Amino acid sequence: MKIAIVCYASVGGSGIVATELAKCLVDRGHEVHLISTDPPFRLGEFRTGLVFHRVETPAYPLFREPQYLLSLSNAIVQLSRELTFDLVHAHYAIPHATAAYLARQILSSTSGAHVPKIITTLHGTDITLLGSDRSYSETVAFSIDQSDGVTAVSESLKRDTYRALDVQRDIRVIPNFVDTNRYRRLPPAELRRQICPSGRYEKLIVHTSNFRPVKRAEAVVEIFKRIRATVRARLVLVGDGPDLAKVSRLVQDLKLGQDVVALGEQDQVVPLLSVADLFLLPSQQESFGLAALEAMACGVPVIASRVGGLPEVIDDGVDGYLKDPEDLQGMAEQALTVLGDAKLHERLAAAARRKVEEKFSADRVVPQYEAFYREVLM
């Protein structure tokens, strides 16, 4: 198949999943064209059959802000005419599903023109935050319904979509995934010694996110403070975003400056996860929880909020633990139990890895997308 994938280039679940899907599809013999404003964060090394197309959005004084929806639609039209895509896969409804619909209408206006099918994948905040906003809701619902096929990354998000929007289109749940050949525990001993010197620290706790309010990174620090009172632990924060400055101030206010290190955005998170003892994800909302899945693949027990799609990823007490988002004390106590019981830690880590291999590996999930593509193209 010849597939166009439209996604955001920034660090975030939708862009990461879209890019990893593109790479996997190419490895399985498809021709894939990534369309975005910049090379996506996880694009990586050159692959034959994977082509990146930059969307240029010129700024004109007449407009208050650049008209990305229009330039993206225009790019899809031009590339479709040149390359005759079988389908356009829009990741994140705003504005990608709308741009794909507009492009299809333009292509359909020419007699005899090749018109690709449109698939939209819903990732989370495109529905729960932006899509349900009255400023966007009617357009988002219309664009979803006009897609030839729609997927969501969890049953939770599927329910949220029907609850928030007047959507009639059937939604197929296809979960997020990781490449288990790449995401596995390969602990570099030197990195562990650098980040968590054995003479000073016993345990290493990690949190990765885009540091937006919904991720509640300040809660991570509050939980860590309770853990640090009992265990010589260090916290590593990976990522960047609008809340990072507030988190840094909280770290200083709590006098944890020596025990918390912020590494910013990192291309490679596997080495960091491979030396971690625990992963914290006390989000207010997670439609799936890709960060938790990546940690589990690397054999890191996860303590997370019982919200959204996380219960579909983590079986409480089997391969991780779930707590109410506001129960920071409960998360801290559970963390201390896991960190203090080597056999429990080993059991959780093994079960987490096994869960990813059995349900969320690329080998399990990418064929579901291929089957859905074929179904839509019939």
Label each region the model flagged.
Residues 5-12, 18, 23-68, 171:
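N-terminal strand-loop element at the rim of the active site
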Residues 248-264:
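Nucleotide-activated donor-binding/catalytic signature segment of Leloir-type glycosyltransferases, i.e.
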Residues 265, 284:
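Aromatic "clamp/platform" in nucleotide-sugar-dependent glycosyltransferases that forms part
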Residues 301-304, 314:
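Short hydrophobic beta-strand element within catalytic cores of glycosyltransferases
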Residues 184-198, 368:
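A short helix/loop element that forms part of the nucleotide-sugar donor recognition site in Leloir-type
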Residues 156, 177:
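Carbohydrate-associated surface elements
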Residues 151, 198-224:
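Conserved donor-binding/catalytic core segment of Leloir-type glycosyltransferases
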